[in-house]
Amino acid sequence: DWETNLAGLKNTRGKCYVNSISLKEGEEEFIRKAIEIRRLGGDVIVMAFDQEGQATTLPRRKEICQRAYNLLISRGGYSPDHIIFDPNILTVGTGISEHDTYAIDFIETVRWIKENLPGAKTSGGVSNLSFAFRGNNKVREAMHSVFLYHAIQGGLDMAIVNPSMLQLYSQIEPELLRCVEDVILNSDPQATER
């Protein structure tokens, strides 16, 4: 809720991050909110979402992040180091083929942001990744760890994650690690079945 975000910004000492704004209500509303956040000393977390919906492919994620970055700098008065992008960590392993690339597309978007939107930071909500495996905490924990391992290598700066839902990457059982790597990196279409 926007009013709650504003109240938090007005009444919190120290640095605040507003999670989140997006282009889904159009450019003018996006800029209005961004300027208000900046005026109150906050940084923005920008979701890869616009009037056409949530970005689910690599090209759409790049397009929306580039557009938001340009608007925040040119019209919002932001310096790049006050912009954080969340390019949407979406659920993989659902059995729906369109979802197979969601994790690797997120990682590639993070890498692209680091190369093309200088100074911007990246973030994401990790638990979304493994919703298809609710009730199987061992698999979910391995998925989160493997995903973070690769996303951090790609340039991920921060993540929203439940630390009790993580395993050490180096301690994941080899067969589980192989299966999870195949799901996250979309390197084997049969990985979810294994």
Language model feature labels by segment:
Residues 1-2, 21-24, 47-52, 88-90, ...:
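Active-site beta-loop-alpha junctions enriched in small/polar residues
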Residues 34-38, 56-89, 99:
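Conserved alpha/beta-domain cores
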Residues 5, 9, 34-35, 62-70, ...:
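Generic structural signal for well-ordered alpha-helices
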Residues 15-18, 41-45, 82-86, 121-123, ...:
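Structural preference for beta-strand elements that scaffold enzyme active sites
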Residues 8, 85, 151:
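Conserved, mostly hydrophobic/aromatic
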Residues 1-54, 58-66:
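Active-site beta->alpha loop and helix N-cap motifs at the rims of alpha/beta catalytic domains
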Residues 59, 92-105, 133-142:
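Short glycine/threonine-rich loop-to-helix capping motif typified by GTGT followed
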Residues 111, 117, 121-124, 128-194:
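Active-site loops and adjacent core secondary-structure elements that bind or stabilize anionic groups
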